[in-house]
């Protein structure tokens, strides 16, 4: 039991490090970007990122949980794991086509996106590259250190380059380009780790891909209800109000999201162990251990 708690606690701690970094890194660049860009341009960045929350939700489609579950249930069978990753990758590629079509319609109909169409499409490329990061795989095999280090290194480089490259209001287009660069670094990092673990991706039949989408749909609905609310507010604000108004709204929502993010690492960290052991006692002990941290947050 002690070993199980230690493993789950380690997973949670690593995910907390990543969650804290997800909050801190944008705040590190916030004063600089607010000084470099006009309020309207900062509003454009915030608005497009809110739209990308939905694009990401569509392409993830709950696979962070359903994929993690399948990887855990594969019980270390490398061949089976490779097939699961291939099947989910196919599903996400199919979903990316749907997400891109929806995005093109939004660009056509929403003025703030239409005016910054190239910026929006480049930002979508960064979300698209997440398909090849396979976070559910490393959560399933409980290699949370890979997930966390991948994020810290790729985003850390992007933040450093932000200070080095972004110099004036005309550099707006460089923001998504730096995000794409960070994602490419993450993709190369992850594929190196997969080779080291001897995991080879093999693709599955179309019927099995559709079946995977069907099984993951319940997780997708859960993610939509839990994640999309804040982004929906910002999207609606951008439809009816100016980019300047979006900037002030997004800043408020960013701090709210920072507090809410403290809860996610607990459920994500114990999920692989719960799937493997189905141990409710472990769940209760972990919750009791980390509750003071969450309450203080």
Task: Mark where each language-model region is.
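Short, Lys/Arg-rich, polar N-terminal cytosolic tail immediately upstream
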Residues: 1-8
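Transmembrane helical elements of multi-pass membrane transporters/channels
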Residues: 11-26, 147, 153-158, 175-194, ...
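Alpha-helical transmembrane segments and their helix-entry boundary regions
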Residues: 15, 42, 84, 88, ...
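Alpha-helical transmembrane segments of multi-pass membrane transport and lipid-handling proteins
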Residues: 20, 27, 59-60, 65, ...
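Helix-loop interface residues and adjacent transmembrane-helix termini in multi-pass membrane transporters
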Residues: 36-39, 113, 140-141, 168-169, ...
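Helix-loop junctions and terminal segments of transmembrane helices
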Residues: 60-76, 256-279
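Hydrophobic transmembrane helix module of multi-pass membrane transport proteins
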Residues: 91-221
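Membrane-water interface at loop-to-transmembrane-helix junctions
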Residues: 211-223, 277-295
């Amino acid at each position: 039991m002690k070993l199980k708690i230690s493993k789950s606690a380690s997973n949670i701690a690593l995910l907390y490090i990543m969650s804290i970094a997800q909050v801190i890194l944008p705040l590190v660049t916030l004063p600089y970007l607010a000084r470099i860009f006009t309020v309207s341009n900062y509003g454009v960045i915030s608005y497009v990122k809110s739209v990308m929350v939905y694009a990401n939700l569509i392409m993830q489609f709950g696979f962070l949980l359903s994929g993690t579950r399948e990887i855990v249930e594969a019980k270390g069978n490398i061949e089976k794991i490779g097939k699961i990753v291939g099947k989910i990758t196919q599903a996400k590629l199919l979903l990316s086509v749907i997400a891109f079509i929806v995005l093109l319609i939004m660009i056509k109909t929403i003025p703030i996106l239409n005016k910054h169409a190239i910026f929006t499409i480049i930002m979508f490329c960064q979300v698209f590259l997440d398909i090849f990061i396979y976070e559910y795989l490393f959560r399933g095999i409980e290699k949370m250190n890979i997930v966390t280090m991948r994020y810290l290194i790729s985003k850390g480089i992007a933040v450093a380059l932000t200070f080095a490259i972004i110099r004036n209001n005309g550099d707006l287009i460089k923001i998504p380009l730096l995000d794409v660069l960070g994602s490419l670094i993450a993709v190369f990092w992850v594929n190196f780790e997969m080779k080291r673990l001897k995991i080879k991706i093999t693709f599955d039949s179309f019927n099995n891909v559709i079946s995977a989408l069907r099984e993951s749909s319940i997780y997708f609905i859960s993610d939509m209800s839990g994640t999309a609310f804040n982004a929906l507010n910002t999207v609606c604000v951008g439809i009816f109000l100016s980019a300047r108004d979006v900037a002030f709204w997004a800043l408020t929502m960013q701090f709210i999201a920072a507090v809410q993010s403290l809860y996610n690492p607990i459920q994500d960290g114990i999920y692989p162990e719960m799937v493997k052991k189905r141990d409710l006692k472990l769940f209760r002990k972990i919750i009791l251990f980390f509750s003071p941290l969450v309450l203080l947050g």
